């Protein structure tokens, strides 16, 4: 498995102000992200990717105020829907967290209103294939649901996947570590931001 720059893209998962940042109502996840200094690690990863022209795609989520297009079919969705302001379209909560250093003149966005993972029912796969991407570096949150779902969907669609372990988080932390070891290690190359950055610099 290779993570060399050619045919590679970086995919961030839900690194938004209302998920991991100052407007998050998910206190345990927000604290885990802060404790791991995750956003700084992601910022370094994205900077390294852009330096070698690796595309960065941000998978984001937002809800309409009437919840149209957001089936409340899971316990977590029903719980979050109890907050009328939860991830409302057009509000600061859906913005990318500035701590990751998004470059909206260069980066791409794949937005959804439904589900827990980024591919199903979105144009993400078509977007990646239009850029001849065959390898993904997936980072963000959470190892509990979103990152795990993204990896499984990506592998099912034929992508090779790498996961930088210092650029993902789950709650509690020991469970996140178990997901990496027992669920993601059989599916993806586990690496680090520094390892990827060094590899990409060496490919120049």
Regions found by a protein language model. Give the residues of each.
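N-terminal nucleotide-binding beta1-loop-alpha1 segment
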Residues: 11-15
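Active-site-adjacent betaalpha module
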Residues: 1-9, 47-52, 69-70, 76-204
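Short beta-strand segments at enzyme active-site cores
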Residues: 54-61, 164
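A short, N-terminal amphipathic alpha-helix
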Residues: 37-55
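N-terminal, charged amphipathic alpha-helical interaction modules
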Residues: 49, 59-64
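Short glycine-enriched, charge-decorated loop/helix-capping segments at active-site entrances
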Residues: 25-34, 85
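Residue-level preference for long, well-ordered alpha-helices that form the structural scaffold
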Residues: 31-38, 172
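Short acidic, Gly/Ser-rich segments with clustered Asp/Glu that frequently serve as metal-coordination loops
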Residues: 16-21
